[in-house]
Each structure stands twice: as C-alpha cells, then as structure tokens.
C-alpha cells in the first residue's frame, strides 16, 4: 500500500484520503504520518461503517480469503464504492454475487489489475479495437520472474516482529493433489486479464497443471529454518474460448527473468 495505493490516492485531486487502517497499530500510525493522512485506526469494520466515507480500498494480504472477501462484502453492504486487490474471493461464484450486489446498489467496483493501463498494453488494446490486427484467434501469455527463486525468501512477504501463530499456514499438506495456488493467482491474473481483453472472448474449457519446484523454503521472515510448503510456484494451462479461439498461459516466480516479466502475444 505504501508504494502504490496510498501515493496514488494522495496525488489525486479527485479525492481526500482521510483514514488509513492496519492491524499493526505502529504501521498504521507511521503511514498516516508519512503521507499526511489525518486519521488512522486498527478496526477495519468500524472504519468501513463510517457514514462520511465514500470509497474503501482493500489492499490487505490475503492468503485464504480471510480479508478481501469479508471486507469487500461489508463495504458494499454499507454502500461504499470498492477498489480491492486480487483475489476478490476464493470462489468465483462469490465474486459474481458481490458484483450483483454492487450493481443492485449502483456502486462502482474495481479489481487492482493495473498492468492493463501500461502504455504498451493500452496501445495493443487500441489496435485490437480498431481492427488493425484482424480476428483474434490465439493468445499466448506468460509472466515469470525470480522473486521466490531463493528458498530463504519467505513464502509470506509480510514483515513480522514475532511468530504469527494465529495465521493459517499455506501448503501444509504435501499431497500433490492438495497443492495451493500461488503463482497462478498472484502472477497469472494480470496477464490473464490482458489476454481476455485482447482475444475478446470468454474461456469455455481449460486444463491446467500446477507444480511445486522449490519444495522447501522459509515460511515467515522470523523463521530460522526452511520447511515443506506445497505451493504453486509454476503452472501452465491451455483453454478453448467460446468463439473457438485458443488461450495459453504459463506463470512462475522461481525462474530467471525480468520483473514482472510479462509476455502477451495475440
């Protein structure tokens, strides 16, 4: 939030950023002082229920749907416009329900898939919309980098002062059939978003495989050891589109490449 969300709100002359909420009291206070925000708090529900707020920006860490979905739901129920980071929810049906709720209340919603606004991507979109490329039949995309190549880099990027015993752990079950989503959601989503816009169609059928190439790593920054974490750090999928086109996607954050290393070919 301190590198993207908050600076963006502060720079905009279309709004007033009035309150920052974080479960870490010291961090909430520090960010408010850093960006000149008049208020800070640690109670998200109380803040969302305030009648003087129009927009809620949900940019919390979300491993198992423990924050994005409930905070977004509450904000919409309270009549707030919502910007939320991915994933909105762990079940796509809940996303559709929240979309319907927002529309029923005349509320604006946005998922933080911002790579689509890069000048190069916008130029690609313009070419497609103007018909200069022709009928889009095939999309190939990948997003890969080496952010988690080093197993000493913690699976959870948050900086903890003490061990977070209250958190549900990712990837505790070593069974390959129980692998938990990581790269596909975190790094695939922005490129999938770009691909769907370019191919101008919806996915009909797909087959996907996820792999755990670096099986042991540190879980938290406070750990002094590595452990088995069954977590998707590389994946591939191919799909049929409803109008007959084909769509392929590959992501990984344990490969040597640029950051963020996005490739989109239509």
Question: Where does each model-flagged region fall?
Answer:
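Predominantly a Rossmann-like dinucleotide-binding segment in NAD(P)-dependent oxidoreductases
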Residues: 1, 118-228
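Short glycine-/small-residue-rich Rossmann-like dinucleotide-binding loops
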Residues: 52, 59-64, 251
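Short, Asp-centered acidic motifs that coordinate Mg2+ and/or phosphate
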Residues: 19, 39, 55, 138
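N-terminal Rossmann-like dinucleotide-binding module
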Residues: 1-35
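NAD(P)-dinucleotide binding in Rossmann-like oxidoreductases
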Residues: 227-234, 242-266
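Conserved SAM-binding strand-loop segment of SAM-dependent methyltransferases
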Residues: 37-44
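Short, conserved SAM-binding/catalytic segment
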Residues: 31-37, 97, 101-102
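Beta-strand-loop-alpha-helix segment that lines the small-molecule cofactor/substrate pocket
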Residues: 55, 63-117, 131
């Amino acid at each position: 939030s301190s590198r993207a969300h908050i600076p963006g709100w502060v720079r905009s002359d279309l709004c007033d950023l009035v309150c920052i909420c974080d479960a870490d009291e010291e961090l909430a206070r520090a960010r408010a002082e850093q960006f000149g925000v008049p208020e800070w708090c640690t109670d998200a529900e109380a803040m969302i229920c305030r009648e003087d707020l129009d927009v809620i920006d949900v940019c919390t860490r979300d491993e198992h749907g423990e924050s994005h979905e409930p905070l977004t739901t509450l904000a919409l129920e309270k009549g707030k416009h919502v910007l939320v980071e991915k994933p909105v929810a762990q079940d796509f049906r809940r996303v559709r329900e929240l979309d319907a709720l927002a529309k029923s209340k005349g509320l604006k919603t946005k998922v933080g898939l911002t790579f689509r606004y890069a000048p190069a991507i916008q130029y690609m979109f313009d070419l497609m919309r103007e018909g200069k490329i022709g009928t889009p039949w095939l999309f190939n995309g990948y997003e890969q980098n080496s952010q988690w190549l080093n197993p000493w880099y913690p699976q959870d990027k948050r900086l903890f002062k003490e061990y977070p015993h209250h958190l549900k752990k990712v990837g505790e079950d070593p069974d390959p059939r129980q692998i938990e989503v990581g790269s596909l959601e975190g790094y695939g989503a922005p490129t999938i978003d770009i691909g769907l816009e370019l191919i101008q169609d919806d996915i009909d059928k797909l087959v996907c495989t996820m792999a755990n190439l670096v099986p042991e790593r540190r879980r938290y920054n406070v750990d002094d050891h590595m452990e088995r974490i069954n977590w998707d750090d590389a994946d591939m999928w191919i799909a049929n589109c409803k109008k007959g086109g084909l769509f392929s996607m590959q992501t990984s954050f344990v490969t040597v490449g640029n950051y963020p290393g996005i490739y989109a070919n239509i």
